[in-house]
């Protein structure tokens, strides 16, 4: 919240979006990246007359182009900071650059959705290649990779037209799976066995079915609860109307059947590879 006070007030809905859609461990990194972007605008461009990020005007943001953001990402590859006594050189790999791009992309997409800017300039952002996981494993994720993955499942970024067409039908389900996977570290079998009845939203908890039939109760945080309820109310319910379904299973295929552990594994692998 301290960083939020250092940024312009027109980003208020962006802050709200982050609280509702991004894991707490990643939200701070988003805000730090956006603040760094604004510091860059002040110190390295003529795009603003402000002396501090908070004073940057919405009119100045409206004039920013995709080329300006691409130049910022290129700047982030290697830059020098004067700390008073010495010059410090910073270098970032493609994974970190992809995270910074994701942070700025989400900000501009939110400004566009709010009607604060006329164009969605993120379509013109240059792609950044990042190493993909091996064919069989689900890799451990760093914070910056988590951010890229959650941005992809939330906005459909970095997808092929075919992937995006399928994502439109399952984006709320996919996000709910990833939020549970990332927040609680659930096994694929535990995700697969979750039911709607596993969740007691009024008490703020849910039940996990462990090996050998053991059950464990877990507290559910606000971001995860909102994501799951959004999926149940707005996406899963439409599947229920179109075909016979496993009525209590939480995660359904488009055919209305409980997803298998294998299909959940492939889903997680797909998003870790984006």
Predicted regions and their residues:
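Conserved catalytic core of the tyrosine transesterase superfamily
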Residues: 1-274
């Amino acid at each position: 919240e301290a960083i939020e006070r250092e940024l312009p007030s027109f980003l208020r809905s962006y802050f709200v979006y982050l609280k509702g859609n991004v894991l707490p461990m990643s939200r701070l990194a988003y805000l730090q990246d956006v603040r760094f972007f604004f510091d860059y605008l002040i110190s390295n461009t003529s795009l603003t007359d402000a002396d501090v990020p908070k004073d940057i005007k919405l009119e100045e943001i409206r004039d920013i182009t995709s080329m300006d953001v691409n130049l910022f990402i290129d700047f982030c590859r290697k830059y020098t900071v004067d700390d008073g006594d010495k010059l410090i050189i910073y270098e970032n790999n493609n994974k970190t650059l992809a995270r910074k791009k994701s942070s700025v992309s989400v900000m501009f997409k939110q400004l566009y959705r709010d009607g604060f800017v006329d164009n969605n300039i993120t379509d013109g952002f240059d792609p950044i290649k990042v190493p993909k996981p091996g064919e069989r494993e689900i890799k451990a994720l760093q914070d910056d990779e988590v951010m890229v993955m959650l941005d992809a499942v939330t906005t459909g970024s970095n997808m092929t037209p075919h992937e995006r067409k399928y994502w439109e039908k399952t984006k709320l389900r996919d996000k709910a799976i990833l939020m549970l996977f990332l927040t609680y570290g659930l096994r694929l079998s535990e995700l697969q066995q979750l039911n709607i009845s596993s969740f007691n939203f009024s008490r703020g908890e849910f039940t996990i079915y462990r090996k050998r039939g053991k059950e464990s109760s877990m507290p559910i945080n606000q971001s995860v609860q909102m994501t799951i309820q959004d999926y149940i109310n707005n996406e899963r319910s439409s599947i229920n109307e179109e075909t016979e379904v496993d009525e209590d299973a939480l995660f359904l295929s488009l055919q209305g059947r409980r997803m298998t552990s294998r299909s959940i594994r492939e889903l997680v692998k797909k998003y870790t590879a984006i």
